[in-house]
Every structure is written in C-alpha cells, then in structure tokens.
C-alpha cells in the first residue's frame, strides 16, 4: 500500500484506492475526497506552502478552518476513535450550529443529551442488551465475544450525543420536525469535521429501544432521531459517491 498525505486536510491517502487526484506542474497529488481536490485546484500554491485547511495531526484545540464544501465532502462515518478527550468547547460549538438548522414555524424541535462517564457506560450496556435480543440463544458461549465487542466499542467512543425530536400525532408536523432535526444533526457532523473530529451517526432499532428511551428520560410525545458518536478519528475511510448528475431530474 502506498500512502501519501492529502495536502489540503492532512489526512493519509491510500493511492491504491483510486483516490481523487490532480496534476500540477508535472506532479500528481492525491486527496482523500473530491472536496479536497477542488480546494487544491483553486489555489495549489497555498497548499504547496503547507497551509492546510486542518492540521496534519488532528488538532486538540478546536479551530474551524475547513470551507463548507470541503467539510461536506470530507465528512466520514468514523467507526474507530482515539481515546483522547474531546474539549467541551468543541461539543458546544457543534450543538450551537445545530440549532441554526431550518425548521418550519420555528418549532425548534430538537433536544441534545450528551453522554460521558457513567452515562456512557450505561448506554454501552443498553446497546449490548439490545443486540442480545436479536439472538435466539444470547447466552450461548459463541455469542459472548460479539456482545463484549459491542460493549467495548461503544464505550471507547469519547462522547455520545443522543438527539431527540418531537413525535406529534399530526403527520405533517411530525415530518417537518423530523426533517428539521436531521438537518440539525448534519450541522453537528459538519462542524465536527471542520474541527478535526470524527463522527458516527446511529439510527435503526437503537433509537426505538424502550430501555434506552427510559434511561435518557425521553418523555411521551418525543423520540430519538439519532445517536452520534464523537471523537478524534483513529482511521478515516475513503468513500465515493455517485455524481449528482446521475441522481438529478430537471423539469422545465
């Protein structure tokens, strides 16, 4: 495997994974995402001087430097985090960005529950317990390593944020508030990326698990929209997306 450094964001790039690339003055440069290539192409001399949009090492002090389009295209679902603590200021900046998401009639339907310490341990137990319910014989010896791994992997996340929203009977209002809350979650993910943090958004059966709702104190009339893991990335996967032209219909 040949690994080089993305001059824009400082992340490692595996050149054998067919990453985005640009040729400048006869030299080929590789990038972890198309957004980094776009930024480089706009001002290559800046990045050749070493003026990265984020440090080669993940910054321990949060500094927002990534342009919005670069943050969007370099955001990844990061499953492996470093144990380094995440500054409270970083979490607060992410949540402050979240509340500026568009929401119909200014309902501001979101609420954020930040888990650390013993609360995070209890969350890890509940996620393990949920997985147990999926096995016909959850006490079987061969199942135990998988359950232990789920617990350990969840506990290894430095910060966990549960995002709740309203669950009104009116289907129109329900859709409006859910859409607004997911936009708020996207704001969280993008600001985290701009701060050098990794995130992983979980939904599925977890957000409907009654013991978790009870633990988090989610009242009747509300539901969990998603759970976000936050930390400094230990590994950032390369990803591709289908070009928008293949997903777009223009009507005139």
Question: Where do the protein language model's features map onto the residues?
Answer:
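Short linker/helix segments within small regulatory modules
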Residues: 19-28
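C-terminal helix-cap and adjacent tail motif
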Residues: 60-64, 71, 224-252
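Cys/His-enriched microdomains
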Residues: 4, 27-30
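Short cysteine-rich clusters marking metal-coordination/redox-active sites
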Residues: 6-9
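N-terminal amphipathic, basic helical "cap/leader" segment at the start of enzyme domains
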Residues: 53-156, 252
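Cys/His-rich metal-chelating microdomains
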Residues: 12, 34-35, 39
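Short Cys/His-rich "knuckle" micro-motifs
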Residues: 16-19, 44
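Small-aliphatic-rich amphipathic alpha-helix that forms the alpha element of a beta-alpha
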Residues: 75, 98, 161, 167-215
